[in-house]
Design a protein with these regions (language model features):
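Gly/Ser/Thr-rich beta-alpha loop segments that engage phosphate groups in nucleotides
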Residues: 45, 91-92, 124, 155, ...
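Cysteine-centered iron-sulfur cluster-binding motifs in ferredoxin-type domains/subunits
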Residues: 36-51, 91
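Classical nucleotidyltransferase
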Residues: 136, 141-190
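N-terminal amphipathic/basic-hydrophobic helices that include classical n-h-c signal peptides
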Residues: 1-16
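N-terminal [4Fe-4S]-dependent radical SAM core
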Residues: 12-40, 53-59, 186-190
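Conserved Radical SAM active-site core
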Residues: 17-22, 35, 53-133, 138, ...
């Protein structure tokens, strides 16, 4: 099997080599509080009508996600004015993307524990992620351990509102992940 070097540790290829990303936005102010680096992963099976990033549904779209990509993202997080990292897509919680994102999350929290990590997902935190994925895949539990805020729920065009803070439709929730895991139910940021 091909090897993938992350943070000086050899890891199997399935831990990250097989993920693509659509775009990286540096100095982004639209996808979480403050100035951030936002990574748009490729691959999504939700196919929400009215999706703002339909091109990223295809898992093969974009560029390969590599340790060099991780290094560029980490370098972008160094300035003090950068508040954190945002993951969106595509769908970060697709299984293949979870495996690809885990080394980035590990290295981000290790180097920048003061920076917050936001993630946008079409899956529901309690029903899909904690209720099913965590039971099937250890990578999901570990991924959640690094995420501070999760915006969950599919985009629903009929519930779209431009007045919502960091979400596209009113069914979506902004969840404090660590507090929710400790409590055993979703704790909303707003």
């Amino acid at each position: 099997t091909a090897q993938y070097k992350a943070g000086g540790t050899e890891m199997p290829a399935e831990m990250g080599i097989n993920m693509n990303y659509a775009e990286i936005k540096y100095c982004d102010i639209a996808n979480g509080p403050g100035v951030r680096t936002s990574l748009f992963v490729s691959g999504c099976t939700h196919h929400c009508p009215g999706c703002f990033n339909e091109i990223a549904w295809d898992f093969e779209y974009g560029k390969p996600f590599t340790q060099e990509t991780i290094d560029a993202i980490l370098a972008s997080l160094e300035p003090g004015y950068i508040a954190g990292l945002t993951l969106l897509g595509g769908e970060p919680f697709e299984y293949a993307n979870q495996q690809g994102l885990l080394p980035l999350l590990q290295q981000t929290k290790s180097r920048f524990p003061q920076k917050n990590i936001w993630c946008f997902t079409g899956y529901l935190f309690d029903k899909d992620i904690c209720g099913q994925m965590c039971e099937k895949w250890d990578v999901t539990r570990e991924m959640l351990s690094y995420i501070d805020v999760l915006v969950d729920g599919k985009f629903m065009q009929e519930l779209k509102s431009l007045n919502l803070k960091f979400k596209g439709s009113s069914n979506q929730r902004t969840i404090l992940v660590q507090e929710s895991l400790a409590k055993g139910s979703p704790v909303l940021l707003f």
